[in-house]
Every structure is written in structure tokens, then in C-alpha cells.
């Protein structure tokens, strides 16, 4: 388990490129036949990926010991979105078939967590966010057909994008975790611009659907102290509450956003005008 400490905004603005990447970038999300796990002190979120190829992958008691409990979800909830081939997640003996861009919410108290791919040649890529939970909500599958896509932006400003809200109160109950998937239209490059911060939640982005010769310049920092991190395909970035989180790519891309914190009000954000950025 890779543990990332919290960092003050005054400290963050003094960091060079390497230090910024060390603090906020998660470079390796998917590793064959393993799970990856990054524990952030910021709102205690855990972020990672699971890619079964030649055999199933189980998250067992070894993780619980690192969290001071018996199992990962003794005091946590888990949200998973599959960005790879078809697979399944077995929760306490119950199999849930999870296809490409299907998602599964797993509530507090689940013990057995086993992840499998249907085909080794096209393995599932289970990306997950995990957050502290105060009560148990039912495990539930969410497919793209269950979410109401919202298209925002304009081709003229290169920010036309479709937002798919998977884990939000209108779709299912969670303790604090929100997750969704945003896809840029072809030829569009900007996400979340004009940008914002939200004092009551932190956020993590996973960028994917990127070609090998492309990248995203992820914008972060306080609005008057902006920095950037160069992102490649299937990499994630941690965004503290005080930081903007926006990006511009060399080509169109897709990203998954996950939020934890004080509330789940999607529009609870502090907007930043473009002319106020520095």
C-alpha cells in the first residue's frame, strides 16, 4: 500500500515537477494479476486498479491488517468502474457480471471480494475508489443505461463533453462516495474549464482512452498559484479541496472522477472565472 500524506497549499506551491508528481500523481493503476492501492490521508480515500489476466484477484485480510481491521470493507464502501473487457466481481459468494463501463457499488461490511476477467486476451480493468463509511448500503450494479448523461460545453471552446453520473444520490445511496465518467467529444480538449474548487470535498481523476503519443496537462493548485502535471493513459491524480482540477489534452480523452468529503451535492462548488486564474 502506497500512503500519501496530506499537503498544505503553501507547501505545494514550492514544489518542483518531480515533487509535484510524487505527491499527487498515481502512475501505475493497472498491473496484471494484482491490485494496486494508494491510501491518501486526504479524506482517507483509497484509489487503485485490479486487472485479472491469468487468474482471479482477491482483496483479502492482508489489506485489513494495514487498515487496523479484518477486511477492507469493515468500515468502508467501495465503488468500481470497469474500463476494460468483460469480467465479474464476486461479493460474498454472489457473482456480479460487470461489462465494459459497467460499475458496481459495494457497501460496508462485505467480506469476500474476488475479481475475474472473462477473457485473458481482453482483461477487465476494474478502477476503484474506496472511502470510510458509517452504515451499510446494498451492493448494486450500475450500467451506462442507468445513468442520465448530461452534455455540456461547446465545440467552439473545445470543451464539449458528456458527464455520466454513476454513484450520485439520484442513482443510488452511498455514505459519501460519488463517482462518474466524463467523455470528451472528438476534437475537444478541455475538461472542467471554467474550473472550480470545492472546500467540502476532495477529488481524484483517472485519465484514460488516450493514445500512446498523447498526454493531458492536468491543472492543479490554488486559482492564483496554478501548476500542471503531465498525465499519460490510465494514470490518476489526487486533487485536494483547495486545488482546481482541470485539464487540456493533445487529443480527446475520457476520465473518471471520484469525490469524497462532507456532502454529495454535485453543484456545491466554488467557480473560478478564467480571468482570475494565475
Swiss-Prot record:
GO terms for biological process: D-galacturonate catabolic process; D-glucuronate catabolic process; pectin catabolic process. Zn(2+) binds at residues 196, 198, 203, 245. Keywords: Isomerase, Metal-binding, Zinc. The keyword Transmembrane helix does not apply. Pfam families: KduI. GO terms for molecular function: 4-deoxy-L-threo-5-hexosulose-uronate ketol-isomerase activity; zinc ion binding. It catalyses: 5-dehydro-4-deoxy-D-glucuronate = 3-deoxy-D-glycero-2,5-hexodiulosonate. InterPro entries: KduI, KduI/IolB_isomerase, KduI_N, RmlC-like_jellyroll, RmlC_Cupin_sf. Catalyzes the isomerization of 5-dehydro-4-deoxy-D-glucuronate to 3-deoxy-D-glycero-2,5-hexodiulosonate. Belongs to the KduI family. This is 4-deoxy-L-threo-5-hexosulose-uronate ketol-isomerase. It comes from Salmonella newport (strain SL254).
